Amino acid sequence: MNARETARQAVKSSVVLLKNEGGVLPLPQGAKVALFGWAQWDAVLSGNGSGAARGGVSPSVVDALKAVGVRPEESLSAWYQDEFKAYHKDNPSEFDFTKIKDAVNSGLMYEIFGKYIPNPPEFSPPQELLDEASRWTDTALWIVGRKSGGEECDRRLENDYYLSNQEKVLLEAICAHFPKVAVVLNGNGLMDLSWVEEHSQIQALLFLGVPGEEGPAALAELLVGKANPSGKLSVTIAKRRNDYPAWEDFSWDKDHPKQIKTYEDYGLTPPLVDRAFAHRPVTAYREDIYLGYRYFDSFGIEPLYPFGFGLSYTCLLYTSPSPRDP
């Protein structure tokens, strides 16, 4: 097994199937699917900052699905591709490395390496494309992308942890036109998922995370049943953000610098390694021993999806036992 095969196998073994009702997954051979979301053309493959990686050899989710026999609705996917190209032409990615020297001298490394990377806007397809796609298939696949979450302070509440207004509009449009909807979560961190149970059309939910360069190909194989999802959650997904005990201590938000907490805010003395920094954000783990699932278990907080949760395509049938002569 070469490196690419190993990377692909790692993805297939770690993707978590959170929901699968009505047998919407795996997709049958030659399935017709309406694809939604900008991430179908630009899947989030890695974190950012020091965790960033760009192989440059990954297919899009669209092309990966075609390679395993799935038939995406061409007009809709072509429209998304045009919209995405136009967005990046008008919003080129820029990073001014000349600022690093000044940042080092001032002790404000946080200002450079905690940079927030906003998600591209979620585009709303024209009504005629929605109508055309819904006449062609009853199944929709929405790839929900999140580019943030790879470095200390680059998460936001609005348009990040929660769906953006554009995503909410798209969600309603998808569910109004397609009775079978599968959603793939493609991003660095967790997000609010209360909207999943509020829409009965969403029959399948996959947590892809950031899968690396073999992610699109591995995802396609999982969606058509060439591989069986076998990943389990390494975290707890809460029903609401306030159920996380550390939520109120999360303060690394450069949009609101006055809310950033330091050692002094907790009555602590900075260690020597941090005293050279003019402003070093800190989060205190006040949960003590009740980190992660221990908090939910100990205090009876029911999660949306518990630590270790993960479904598969396998169906087991149990019948009543009966004695049999040896």
Task: Kindly give the residue locations of the regions a language model identified.
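C-terminal non-catalytic regions of proteins with extracellular/luminal or membrane-system context
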Residues: 1-320
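A short, hydrophobic C-terminal helix/tail in secreted or cell-surface proteins
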Residues: 321-326
